[in-house]
Amino acid sequence: MGAAPSRIVDNLLDDTNFDRAEIERLKKRFMKLDKDSSGSIDKTEFMSIPGVSANPLAKRIIEVFDEDNSGDVDFQEFITSLSIFSGRGETDAKLRFAFRIYDIDKDGYISNGELFIVLKIMVGTNLEDEQLQQIVDRTIMENDVDGDGKLSFEEFKKAAETTEVIQSLTLQHNI
């Protein structure tokens, strides 16, 4: 391992919840996923991760993992994002990641339209659009403390704390 990769691992030790052995193990998994050896995982490679392709929010998850908006997920982005979901991940970081799934335009708020889009992805054709819109409207109305018609992170966080969202954002598997 050269100086640059060693420095990356050292940075990841400081910035994540993983120890050196876990990072090395995840690096091997990352390299297996990186089928074209480009140093990053594209959408197709990301979808080959077990359980990801079946997740209706897979596209949004990839976009949130991709911090620099390059279209691919590099090793640092991969490890940093996975760290959030480890058992040692902080609740606030887990909720911020979930918030970013909904905040499609990255303006720091979840609008009525964004909430509708993400929930539509999740429920598919199981609900009529009118029913879904009623749920979205009620969700915004019940949680929009400042009355601006959208949810800030703090409003989202308060709403999520009353549900089992935090538990569902923790990986239960040994990495």
Swiss-Prot record:
Note: This protein has four functional calcium-binding sites.
GO molecular function: calcium ion binding
Domain EF-hand: 21-56, 58-88, 90-125, 131-166
InterPro entries the record matches: EF-hand-dom_pair, EF_Hand_1_Ca_BS, EF_hand_dom
Function (record text): Regulatory subunit of calcineurin, a calcium-dependent, calmodulin stimulated protein phosphatase. Confers calcium sensitivity.
Protein name: Calcineurin subunit B
Superkingdom of source: Eukaryota
Subunit structure: Composed of a catalytic subunit (A) and a regulatory subunit (B).
Residues annotated as binding Ca(2+) 1: 34, 36, 38, 40, 45
Residue numbers binding Ca(2+) 4: 144, 146, 148, 150, 155
Protein residues bound to Ca(2+) 2: 66, 68, 70, 72, 77
Species assigned in the record: Kluyveromyces lactis (strain ATCC 8585 / CBS 2359 / DSM 70799 / NBRC 1267 / NRRL Y-1140 / WM37) (Yeast)
Binding site for Ca(2+) 3: 103, 105, 107, 109, 114
Matching SUPFAM superfamilies: EF-hand
GN (gene name): CNB1
Alphabetic keyword roster: Calcium, Metal-binding, Repeat
Protein family per UniProt: Belongs to the calcineurin regulatory subunit family.
SMART domains per the UniProt record, alphabetical: EFh
